[in-house]
Amino acid sequence: MCAMIDEKVREIKKELRLAMNGVVSSIQRNYGLNYKINFGIEIPRLKGIASNFEKDEELAKRLWQDNIRECKMLAIFLMPESSYAGVAEQWIAEAPFTEIADHLTMVILSKLPDAAAKAIQWIQNSEGLFRYCGFMTLTHLFRKGVALDKEQESIYLAITKDIETTESRKSVIMAAYNSLGHYCDDEE
């Protein structure tokens, strides 16, 4: 099994090298996305590469271990839905940048069976990208029409109300406001 995973990883990395976009990679580095390796491959192209492989938990976990932007993205796209809960919090803790967190919330976190409850826990956690992922997960849930229960709503509104005084990271503040905009859409 390990040899098959190794072979798939080699095949994926070969495809990544062939699809490399040095200009995009350079621009991303200039914006602070300092991965060990960044091929600069656009998301639609990455999704195309992912479509050539079966969803596979072991392959996804293996790709996630590499500090390569595209491998982390492919890990998200290749993780089977039945395995989402097993990696969710570990991957939030290990997500290096909001770009990865954005795809993590859209593809995995917002599809967890208890996504709303988890997101409320995460917005209460200021470590790393947990709060950011919590707000972005809520944004996706609100877009789908998911409602919070009364206790969750109370916590959400209290944290969001004070976000500018309790949070220094602009990305988290913007994620909070983004989620609030979609929350308010549901209230109308």
Regions found by a protein language model. Give the residues of each.
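Alpha-helical scaffold domains
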Residues: M1-E188
